[in-house]
């Protein structure tokens, strides 16, 4: 794999650090009044998910990580693995729960997810930024009941619980932002 110099560091770059692929979250070039310039880098280890800060001397090189990001459709979960399929080649890949993390709350069959592969093994699964999920359980919103915060908890078909407006009812499809876990709107009906 290619090597990257510290002057090529930018957010989103994937590098190898201590034998583990990492994603650069932030990069700051520091030029002290005395001495050599250095880069202060915030890194997330892709396998363990740990976030750490590391400094590199100016001009230092680091090996690039041989990771691949692919878009696959979620099929089903069998208890041990979550299965995804490439819609063009129909090749299937199973991901362990540790690769999914919080994403498991937003997986709906057929949705496209971004999967990061390292040596052919899924290490992270990211759901689309917005997903549409059915509401399976919520309290009825009573007319004129606006004394509270104007929201109520609702359980989605995936098991996740989000706050929704009072007018949303059981059986409706809602649009959720997976990055924040918040209600965005009712899902638009296909004509």
From Swiss-Prot:
Compartment(s) where it occurs, according to its Swiss-Prot or TrEMBL record: Cytoplasm
SUPFAM superfamilies: Nucleic acid-binding proteins, Translation proteins SH3-like domain
N6-(3,6-diaminohexanoyl)-5-hydroxylysine: residues bearing it: 34
Domain of life: Bacteria
UniProt KW Cytoplasm keyword: yes
Xref: InterPro entries: Elong-fact-P_C, NA-bd_OB-fold, Rib_uL2_dom2, Transl_elong_fac_P/YeiP, Transl_elong_KOW-like, Transl_elong_P/YeiP_cen, Transl_elong_P/YeiP_CS, Transl_elongation_fac_P
HAMAP family per the UniProt record, alphabetical: EF_P (MF_00141)
NCBIfam families on file: efp, PRK00529.1
Protein's name in the database: Elongation factor P
Source organism: Colwellia psychrerythraea (strain 34H / ATCC BAA-681)
């Amino acid at each position: 794999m290619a090597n990257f110099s510290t002057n090529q560091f930018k957010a989103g770059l994937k590098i190898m650090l201590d034998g583990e692929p990492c994603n650069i979250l932030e990069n700051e070039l520091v030029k002290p009044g005395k001495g050599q310039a250095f880069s202060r880098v915030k890194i997330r280890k892709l396998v363990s998910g740990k976030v750490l800060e590391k400094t590199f001397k100016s001009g230092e090189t680091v090996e690039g990580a041989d990771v691949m990001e692919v878009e696959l459709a979620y099929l089903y979960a069998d208890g041990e693995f979550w299965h995804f399929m490439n819609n063009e080649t129909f090749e299937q890949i199973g991901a362990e729960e540790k690769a999914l993390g919080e994403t498991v709350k937003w997986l709906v069959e057929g949705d496209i997810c971004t999967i990061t592969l390292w040596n052919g093994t899924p290490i992270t699964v990211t759901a689309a930024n917005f997903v549409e999920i059915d509401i399976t359980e919520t309290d009825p919103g009573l007319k004129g009941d606006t004394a509270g915060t104007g929201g109520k908890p609702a359980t989605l078909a995936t098991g996740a619980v989000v706050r929704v407006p009072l007018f949303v009812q059981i059986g409706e499809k809602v649009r959720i932002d997976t990055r924040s876990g918040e209600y965005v709107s009712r899902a638009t009906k296909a004509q």
